Amino acid sequence: MAPQRPKGAGALDVPPALSPAPVPPRSTELYAALDLGTNSCRMLIAQPKGSGFHVVDSFSKSVQLGAGLEKTGRLSRGSMTRTIQALRICQQKLRRNKVRRMRLVATEACRRAANGAEFMQRIQRETGLKLDIIKPEEEAQLAVISCAPLVNRKTHNLLVVDIGGGSTELVWIDISKVPKADRAQSIMRLHGGVHQAKT
């Protein structure tokens, strides 16, 4: 049973659970997740281990991509240059680890900037990485999924607050009607899994 959100709760609308659930990851494969936010660029490369993941490599850099965005409505030349430099390091790590399954996303700064889509094209040209500018709803969805391992059998309601550099997402989910043994897994079904990409 899919987790439910009370009507009128004021949280972001979360789509119903996708069915069937994503195919379980292969233990020999590496997976990567990259989050390009308003202030920082972060990436994790991990390998499935048991019911979780073992981190193989990681990267985090303050790029201040959203610096000056409030005044100009655009990403500045300096912030884009800093970000490109950080993403080149990420690309090298992905290639060195031979990662083929990944999800690379950009959030609020690129959503709001008039030149956000243009910057995504530049990133692909200069680094070979294809980033998706995701909507606030999907950003909130991913935040909820990341909390799934913290959900235990006694959890009835879940409030997730994702505070970023340029936006804050809140999601309230009622999982009281989901069988206790399935509660964490039902949250994982909120998303369609990972993407395969070239580096």
Predicted regions and their residues:
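Active-site or pore-adjacent capping/gating segments
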Residues: T168
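Nucleotide/phosphate-binding catalytic cleft detector across ATP-hydrolyzing
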Residues: M1-L36, L44-I163, V171-T199
